[in-house]
């Protein structure tokens, strides 16, 4: 085996960031593109050092005419490498990027669960991280959206998603594939400029590189890395603040299905008033995530946060689903909208 600088870098990253334990089962998501081929080749070469059992999973979205041929191509690669292969095909074509991503992670989790894989590994790179940060920035987001692709995150209670290539650019994965003559399957949808992410990749980032910083891609990805550490700290601190400020009391019906129907949730305003605005907002977002069916937006978070310093008996307009929040002295009370006071 030829040991390259990229092999050494990924080996070092896995060890220093504690991405995997040795002698575990890793399910590698392989589309057939350059990033996933680079990933599986690196893991196969590192396998003797770590004692992993590797499997390859391919998800066929059925949104290209050549998708079946693409799946067969990946299956043949897996057979040539002597690696278990798993194929999941969408029952109907998946038409949006968001829907495709959600279906893909569900499919990968199901395969991993059925075949006892502890890790799902994807080939997301620093280039993907930069694109995701820019995409979220233009949609409007906080630091949580700007941290853009984390090294690890749990998909289920016992399956961890891992992205070992987040410090590697797409240019590097292309060079690696060329060096080892890996047969890349070109995905024609990556060239389709109707997708916002493709416009960022094909037009915006090259413009930034040509006119502002040749290393713009890495610089933006490094910003995401710095923000990730900040977000993790703020989330932990906000969780502690929430636990300090939050109380349950017997009273009117509270909306959270996970709570006993006889309990009301109330928040101590004096505790929250001592905290900086950044933590106040995070506490309110965490609370709203528990009681709303969909993710809270900026307006929802702001109107609940405003009650921390609002006059007595101030209250919000109803949130989606009917919940309202009202100030009662030193407390913010979350209650059913039908109980709204006049």
UniProtKB/Swiss-Prot annotation:
GO terms for cellular component: cytoplasm. GO terms for biological process: tRNA modification. Keywords: ATP-binding, Cytoplasm, Ligase, Nucleotide-binding, tRNA processing. GO terms for molecular function: ATP binding; tRNA(Ile)-lysidine synthase activity. ATP binds at residues 31-36. Pfam families: ATP_bind_3 (PF01171), TilS (PF09179). It catalyses: cytidine(34) in tRNA(Ile2) + L-lysine + ATP = lysidine(34) in tRNA(Ile2) + AMP + diphosphate + H(+). NCBIfam families: lysidine_TilS_N. The N-terminal region contains the highly conserved SGGXDS motif, predicted to be a P-loop motif involved in ATP binding. PANTHER family: TRNA(ILE)-LYSIDINE SYNTHASE-RELATED. This is tRNA(Ile)-lysidine synthase. It comes from Nostoc sp. (strain PCC 7120 / SAG 25.82 / UTEX 2576). The lineage of its organism: Bacteria, Bacillati, Cyanobacteriota, Cyanophyceae, Nostocales.
